[in-house]
Amino acid sequence: MIEGVMKEGFITTSYDSVVNWAKTGSLWPMTFGLACCAVEMMHAAAARYDIGRFGAEVFRASPRQSDLMIVAGTLCNKMAPALRKVYDQMSEPRWVISMGSCANGGGYYHYSYSVVRGCDRIVPVDVYVPGCPPTAEALIYGIIQLQQKIRRTHTIARV
């Protein structure tokens, strides 16, 4: 592809490829840190790992400014409506990463009366990051997997 650009001065591609490339390079995450996994999420954003290299530069505090929610930690029954409300306020297209055993399926507190057994019962999840707590490398790998999923989606519906 590079040789074609150097010789001809242009490349040909599809609209889907360009839009999906732009989406993968500008993920704006919103924190939904609920427990100890949030510490690893902050660790991934710090200087050593710097998820800004992967397009997730700044964690947003407002759901209207973000398109990626990282649910990190134990989701209790009282917090579940707030999670859904914040998810509904996010702009389209929106994605969710479930980070840690507790967010994935209840984890250590799976049999507790007050714990939701997986945030996928409340919001649709795109990528699951396992671990208790998962490392910063695992979260970065999850972001890379989400970027690959975004690249495979179709923006324009073919009729």
UniProtKB/Swiss-Prot annotation:
Domain of life the protein comes from: Bacteria
Binding site residues for [4Fe-4S] cluster: C36, C37, C102, C132
Locations listed in the record: Cell inner membrane
GO molecular function: 4 iron, 4 sulfur cluster binding; iron ion binding; NADH dehydrogenase (ubiquinone) activity; NADH:ubiquinone reductase (non-electrogenic) activity; quinone binding
Cofactor remark: Binds 1 [4Fe-4S] cluster.
Annotated membrane topology: Peripheral membrane protein
Keywords: 4Fe-4S, Cell inner membrane, Cell membrane, Iron, Iron-sulfur, Membrane, Metal-binding, NAD, Quinone, Translocase, Transport, Ubiquinone
EC number annotated for this UniProt entry: 7.1.1.-
Entries under NCBIfam families matching the protein: nuoB_fam (TIGR01957), PRK06411.1 (NF005012)
Function: NDH-1 shuttles electrons from NADH, via FMN and iron-sulfur (Fe-S) centers, to quinones in the respiratory chain. Couples the redox reaction to proton translocation (for every two electrons transferred, four hydrogen ions are translocated across the cytoplasmic membrane), and thus conserves the redox energy in a proton gradient.
Protein name, per record: NADH-quinone oxidoreductase subunit B
Species of provenance: Paracidovorax citrulli (strain AAC00-1) (Acidovorax citrulli)
Classification of source organism: Bacteria, Pseudomonadati, Pseudomonadota, Betaproteobacteria, Burkholderiales
Gene (name only): nuoB
